[in-house]
Amino acid sequence: MSRQHAAYIDYALNRMKKMPIEMLGSDTITLKPYQHFVAKVFLGLDTMHSILLFHDTGVGKTITTVFILKHLKDIYTNWTILLLVKKALVEDPWMNTILKYSPEIIKNCIFINYDDKNFHNKFFTNIKTISSRSRVCVVLDECHNFISKSLIKEDGKQRPTKSVYNYLSKNISLNNNKMICLSATPIVNNVREFTMIVNLLRPKIIQFQSLFENKNLVNEKELIDKLGGICSYIVNDEFSIFDDVEGSQSFAKKTVYMHYVNMTKQQEIIYQKAKIAEIKSGIASFRIYRRMAATFSFDSFPDKKKKTIDEITLELGALYKDFVNYVNKKSFSNNAIKLFKSGKGLTGDSNPLDISLLSELRQKSCKFTEVCLKILASPGKCLVFEPFINQSGIEVLLVYFSVFCITSVEFSSRTKDTRIKNVFEFNKESNTNGEQIKVCVFSISGGEGISFFSINDIFILDMTWNEASLKQIVGRAIRLNSHANTPPNRRYVNVYFIIARLSSGEPTVDEDLINIIKTKSKEFFQLFKVFKESSIEWIYKNKKDFYPINDESGWRALTSRVVDVNVKSKRTVQLAQGQNIWFSNSSRMVTIHKGFKTSDGKIFDVDGNFIQNMPINPIIKIHNDKLVYII
């Protein structure tokens, strides 16, 4: 059926061929060809009521969307635009972009924050005010967050956001309304999110049942066929977050390092107490205490089972004050800082006060100490991701920065009033080399919707629960032309996963989370492939054998067909001669995959999916007594 989808895409492009490629407002911008393509297809089909912009961070999803909103009047005169976004993203990028390039539509825009606890009430209140003569265009930014808030809880209770989800799913397709969903990571935590977002875009075409059997999609072909044209797919980095990616004229090179640091004896003691406390309290699966202890350990671990929350808060506050008082007004000597900046450590001839201070700081946090040393040795600006803010998180990290004489700004929930200005100062061209502000430390609040320029090193101090969040974090620094002002020899980003290690060799919470991420990624990769091959770009490029059409009367029927996941696609089993191999996409072998190489040089993964042909002169390395091909 993809040929039929291609015919409708071609019809839309012809219908909108006179659409300008420039967007004029108080400023002027020329769209990239891929942005213009999306706009022409979406606006060229009146009955194409929804689309997912599955675009990498930094390729211009916001610009594409604002261009579409600007030209809604080309197909109908009266529109109400509902922008459902996180509060942190209203001003920048949305308000700023609209006011710069399409100020005339601002009077038609209603912003509603879906991270507001009263979101659903505000949504339905605004819906009631919309004139019956007006069509509605909904923009759902970072739609994976909205989907996550719409999932039914494990106890079976429906979240308030689900009522908004149900309304959009039912009503957007009526009266030629439109909806644009934006995300660089449309599936984050669970494969159920795939079904949720598909049914939001194409109501009720997938039933809530398992799409996988033994971690393999039951019917990939059926999904691709029925979901044709559901999204626009612009993903330049299809590699795992743990793999290296070569740079290009527009994007910086990415190099990944698994950087292991050994806990001190004191930190190990607190870490083991945290582990026991998790087991006793029944929250071991969340690993909160261990994650905090692996990052920073106070001199004692509060017994949280015998105390109230207020008592625990007071005790942690006292421990924090004790630590601050201890290091207050302490800092390393100029000679020590010079050594650290040159990438060297202290020696026996160094100032005893410097040696003692470094030892004390490392006793409490092997991670914070190591990151500070690497920041000072970095030639450019740095980002540090730390999800925790109070107790053992950003609050303490900033104390370490002070001792190491590191200048920084913070982007987190506690800096809401200043964080946009902080990032603006950090991104200034005059600060390209980090001479005024060396580091921006950010929590999960900084994982979406903001951009950083001329970053050379990213340090991830604590893992998220999924690869998608990690991609969002790294994607803040590797964006289209993000390193344009950086000297050519520094157009790279080193990504360091800082992993705490126990002397016993027992896996730590950091290593546990990495394994969880890798397990989830296998299923997500297959679903992303479905999005790719059902995208308007893939169809138009690969499906040339179609009959031109003169109207769009059949589009709604074509895109309303129900997916039958119970019918398994036929698999052709073929025998091939060859050998089992190990391969990696990274020369540092961050992730190693098991595969099969045929006698004629074709490489397949363990599920029989073709990867690529073996290079003529392959690079082979040895890792844990395995011969590993670097491809």
Curated annotation (Swiss-Prot):
Protein's UniProt name: Nucleoside triphosphatase I
The entry's function note states: DNA-dependent ATPase required for providing the needed energy to achieve the termination of early transcripts. Acts in concert with the RAP94 subunit of the virion RNA polymerase and the capping enzyme/VTF to catalyze release of UUUUUNU-containing nascent RNA from the elongation complex. NPH-I must bind ssDNA in order to exhibit ATPase activity.
Q: Which reaction does it catalyse?
A: a ribonucleoside 5'-triphosphate + H2O = a ribonucleoside 5'-diphosphate + phosphate + H(+)
Q: SMART domains from the xrefs?
A: DEXDc, HELICc
Enzyme class of the recorded protein, top EC level: hydrolase
Q: Which family does it belong to?
A: Belongs to the helicase family. NPH I subfamily.
**Summary of subunit composition and partner proteins:** Monomer. Interacts (via C-terminus) with RAP94 (via N-terminus). Interacts with the cap-specific mRNA (nucleoside-2'-O-)-methyltransferase.
Organism, per UniProt?
Answer: Yaba monkey tumor virus (strain VR587) (YMTV)
The residues covered by the Helicase ATP-binding domain are 42-204
Query: Under which EC number(s) is this enzyme classified?
Result: 3.6.1.15
Q: What gene is it encoded by?
A: NPH1
Q: For binding ATP, which residues are annotated in this chain's numbering? A: 55-62
Where's it mainly located? Answer: virion
Ranges where the Helicase C-terminal domain occurs: 367-536
Superkingdom, taxonomy of origin: Viruses
Reply yes or no: does the keyword Coiled coil apply: no
Q: Where is this motif: DEXH box?
A: 141-144
Picking any one GO biological process from the record gives: DNA-templated transcription
Q: Which SUPFAM superfamilies match?
A: P-loop containing nucleoside triphosphate hydrolases (SSF52540)
Spans annotated as Binding to the cap-specific mRNA (nucleoside-2'-O-)-methyltransferase:
457-524
Q: Where in the cell is it found?
A: Virion
Instruction: Give the InterPro entries listed for this entry.
Output: Helicase_ATP-bd, Helicase_C-like, NPHI_C, P-loop_NTPase, SNF2_N
